[in-house]
């Protein structure tokens, strides 16, 4: 008797689990994932170059404006995509809001590093890139967690 009841119970539990995903998390968006990945890769490369001493001189800033702009553009698209995701219930909206907040936090850190680079250059091994890397890592993980 318990064997015959077990299958429907497992099926019901599976359906409820899948249905709860729509309640607690927004649907996966491949464009959002692609944009945050592009931005994160740009941030990681920029941080690695800075930590290797390539940007000690503020005169190197004009040569990296395009890199900063590309990262910021990818983050802007990611933030818009994240903010406009459809959702089924309030918990999913909270997840979306957190995702957008993390993306905007990453963008603010990139902007801060760009300003530092422009004003005085980036000295390696001073932690100048750490906040940006941590913030952008959190944003990327939040987006990829929706897969």
Predicted segments, located by residue:
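Post-signal peptide N-terminal segment of mature Sec-exported envelope proteins
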Residues: 28-51
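A charged, solvent-exposed segment within the mature domains of Sec-exported extracytoplasmic proteins
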Residues: 116-147
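Long, amphipathic, charge-rich alpha-helical segments that form helical bundles/coiled-coils
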Residues: 72-126
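Bacterial signal peptide processing site
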Residues: 22-24
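Bacterial N-terminal signal peptides that target proteins for export
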Residues: 1-12
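Short, charged, amphipathic alpha-helical segments
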Residues: 58-69, 93-97, 123-130, 134
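C-terminal motif of bacterial Sec signal peptides marking the signal peptidase cleavage site
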Residues: 17-20
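Alpha-helical segments in soluble extracytoplasmic regions
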Residues: 48-90
């Amino acid at each position: 008797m318990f064997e015959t009841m077990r299958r429907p119970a497992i099926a019901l539990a599976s359906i409820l689990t899948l249905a709860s995903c729509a309640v607690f998390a927004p649907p996966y968006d491949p464009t959002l994932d692609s944009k945050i990945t592009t931005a994160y890769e740009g941030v990681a490369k920029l941080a690695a170059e800075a930590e290797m001493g390539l940007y000690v001189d503020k005169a190197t800033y004009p040569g990296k404006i395009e890199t900063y702009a590309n990262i910021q553009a990818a983050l802007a698209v990611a933030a818009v995509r994240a903010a406009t995701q459809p959702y089924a219930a309030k918990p999913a909206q909270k997840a979306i809001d957190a995702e957008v907040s993390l993306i905007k936090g990453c963008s603010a850190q990139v902007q801060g590093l760009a300003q530092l680079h422009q004003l005085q250059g980036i000295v390696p091994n001073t932690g100048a890139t750490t906040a940006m890397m941590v913030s952008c890592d959190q944003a990327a993980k939040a987006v990829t967690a929706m897969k």
